[in-house]
Amino acid sequence: MNTLPKLHNATWPGLVGKGPDSEPVIAFDQLLEMTAAAEVGGVKFDGIDVGLLEPHIYLDQTEEAKKLAEKVSKHGLKVGSLVAPIWAGSAMGTADQRKTFVEMVRKSCEFGQQLKALGVRDYGIVRIDSAAGVSDWAKDPLGNSKLIAKTFQEAADIAAGYGEKLAAEGEICWGGMHSWKHMVELLEMTDRKNVGFQADMSHTFLYTMGYNAPEHRILPVDADLKDREVIKAAIKTVSDALRPWTIDF
């Protein structure tokens, strides 16, 4: 009998795109309450995936993991994947920026291990990206991809010491990861057993449309997006390429 994948709600939509000039931030406690209460056809969330981002999570506070564990346990939830706040650095930046990137991964892995010790995290990855723009990457595509891969390798070695896997999220906005082909190339360059791909399904679809990388477009410009067979064929091309690397959705 197959075991169904664990179904988790993400906390970072409560922060991303929100703030003083937009919609208000959704408080972490409110997100937990909504997650625990949600139910469709008898199916409920098993847990949450947590963005280690302020004001939801203060990564440098010593009691933060304990407070989080108490909150999720109260609602009968588990913690799964974690989003490392790597944007204070960059995987293809200066030496100091790359050092900051790796340090943020280390802190995230340590936090994840604390949650495991507290009994609320039994699975999940640590999510990363290149923390670099597409236009900056395009100034030296090969050189920058090699530098990103080197940073990912350093971060992977740190993560391995904590028993963690890193997953690069396939988003079109991150340099070196902005097309399905570049994503595969970067993963091959990185070549670490504990580094894989996290599929964001909307961005995976955008891969097929060649956003930020028209040369890697699969769907024709005039494709009928109501034609499910055309869509399925395009997604299959992307899926076939990235499936060997995919460790999180």
Regions found by a protein language model. Name each.
Residues 112-141, 162-173:
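Active-site groove signature of glycoside hydrolases
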Residues 166, 197-198:
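Residue-level marker for buried hydrophobic side chains located in beta-strands
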Residues 1-122, 142-146, 150-160, 192-196, ...:
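N-terminal pre-domain/capping segments
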Residues 10-14, 50-55, 84-87, 131-133, ...:
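Active-site beta-loop-alpha junctions enriched in small/polar residues
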Residues 23, 147, 174-192:
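Short, motif-level signal for alpha-helix interfacial/capping segments enriched in acidic residues
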Residues 58-59, 172-185, 203-214, 220-235:
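Active-site glycine- and acidic-residue-rich loops that bind
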